[in-house]
Structures are given as C-alpha cells and as structure tokens.
Regions:
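Membrane-anchoring hydrophobic helices of lipid-metabolizing enzymes
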Residues: 2-118
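Catalytic core of membrane glycerolipid acyltransferases/transacylases, capturing the structured
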Residues: 112-143
Length: 143
C-alpha cells in the first residue's frame, strides 16, 4: 500500500513538472530542466553505477572527463524529459530537428528494405518521427 501511495505522489510531481514545462515554453524549459536534472540527478543512487560503467568503458578517462560525460548525460535526460510533452510540437515544426544526409531518405520511398542507425541528442523518438513524415514505413527498435 505504501508503494502505491509513493507512486501516486511521484506521479503528481511528474505531472506538475510537465505542466510547468508546458507553461514556460520549450526553449526555456529545456534550459531549466537540463539544469534541474544536472543538480538533482547525482543525488540518486545510480551515480555509483554510472561511474562504474564509465570506468569499465575506459579506465583511461580522467576524473574531469568522466565528470563532463556524466554532466552531459544528466542535461540530456532533462531535455528528453521535457521534450516528451512537446512531441506534438516537433511533429509540426521541422526547425528544431536537424538530420545530416536527410536528402538520402527521399530515395527510400521505393519500398526497398533499409536499416537506419543514428546517434541522438535528447529525444530519440524524433528520428523515427521525421522518417515517418516522409511517408516511409518504419519499424523501430531502441536499445
């Protein structure tokens, strides 16, 4: 029962953050939530897991390099969090998404199979949204 009450209050906090994010607009919300996640994120127990994973990735990283990666990750989480409530905006507005080589996508409408591999910054759903805008059938797998 306590778990359900805890989840209820967590949901209220998330919804309030979404409402605030929607009220202040996407550009300001991205900045504020990047800073918020950067400030609050390291307080969670996942901090040790993140640090250990980076040590496994490369034991040659300096402390400042590791810290820079971790800070970038928390900022990215902040942007991703807030962008979920703006997915409808991204569907209508192309100016916020950039894709190098997007001219190559046009030639893919002849129903031949293709695999897209992407790097992403912030919200990873945006790539598939942009491809689907071009009327290309798409199945998406995230890992």
């Amino acid at each position: 029962m306590l778990k359900k009450i805890n989840y209820f209050f967590q949901a209220i906090i998330i919804y309030l953050l979404f409402i605030i994010g929607r009220l202040i607009g996407i550009n300001i919300a991205r900045k504020i939530f990047s800073y918020l996640f950067l400030s609050v994120g390291p307080l969670f127990k996942s901090k040790k897991i993140i640090e250990n994973n980076l040590k496994i990735f490369s034991d040659k990283l300096t402390d400042s390099e590791r810290e820079k990666i971790i800070n970038g990750m928390w900022k990215n989480y902040g942007m991703t969090f807030i962008e979920y409530i703006y997915l409808d905006y991204f569907k209508k507005n192309n100016s916020l998404v950039s894709a190098k080589g997007s001219e190559n996508i046009i030639s893919l409408t002849d129903n031949k199979p293709v695999i897209f591999v992407s790097g992403h910054f912030a919200n990873f759903e945006l790539m598939s949204m942009e491809i689907r805008k071009r009327k290309i059938k798409l199945a998406t797998i995230y890992r």
